[in-house]
């Protein structure tokens, strides 16, 4: 628990207003698979895995290198991502919508040209999909490997569909609906940089 407290000490406190919305389960609710998966400590492993895989997309890397505060304020950057995941998963709908707007505002000015001389924009649905889909796949893979019990195929698909419901609010596209579709989408992504 102290790791979580320390993480959120570097940014806003998530779910600060949830009790102001009694009876509002948010976009997913307590019976969702996401509440179970994202409440497990394996998400930390999933987050690290996601960063490694996300770096296989040159334009995503360029956006992070050129625009992010991850070098000067790594804990703050991590905290802001954690707040977004926490609020969109567990928050009441007004908190979910506010978290999405924070990300939209933060991503609006993120654009430029990568080392491959290709344009990038954090607002592009395809780039948002890469980041989100890899994060979802990584959370799922980490939970399956290190969580208290593996999810059934049905629950793994539910998790992917639930996370897709959240990120649709950001305008990301395309968004696979099942675990198998998600794995295939990442493996076959045309913008993925593959080196031998």
For each feature predicted by the language model, list its residue ranges:
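Mature, function-bearing regions of proteins
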Residues: 1-130, 136-196
């Amino acid at each position: 628990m102290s790791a979580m407290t320390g993480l959120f000490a570097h940014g806003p406190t998530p779910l600060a207003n949830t009790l102001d919305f009694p009876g509002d389960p948010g976009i997913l609710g307590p019976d969702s698979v996401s509440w179970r998966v994202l409440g497990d400590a394996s998400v930390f492993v999933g987050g690290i895995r996601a960063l490694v895989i996300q770096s296989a997309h040159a334009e995503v890397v360029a956006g992070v290198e050129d625009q992010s505060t991850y070098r000067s304020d790594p804990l703050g950057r991590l905290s802001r991502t954690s707040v977004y995941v926490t609020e969109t998963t567990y928050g009441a709908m007004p908190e979910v919508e506010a978290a999405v707007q924070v990300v939209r505002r933060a991503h609006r000015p993120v654009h430029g040209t990568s080392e491959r001389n290709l344009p990038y924009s954090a607002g592009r649905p395809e780039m948002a999909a890469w980041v989100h889909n890899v994060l979802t796949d990584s959370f799922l893979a980490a939970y399956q490997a290190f969580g208290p019990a593996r999810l059934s195929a049905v629950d793994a698909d539910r998790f992917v569909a639930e996370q897709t419901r959240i990120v649709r609010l950001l305008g990301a596209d395309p968004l696979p609906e099942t675990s198998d579709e998600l794995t295939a989408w990442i493996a076959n992504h045309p913008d993925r940089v593959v080196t031998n």
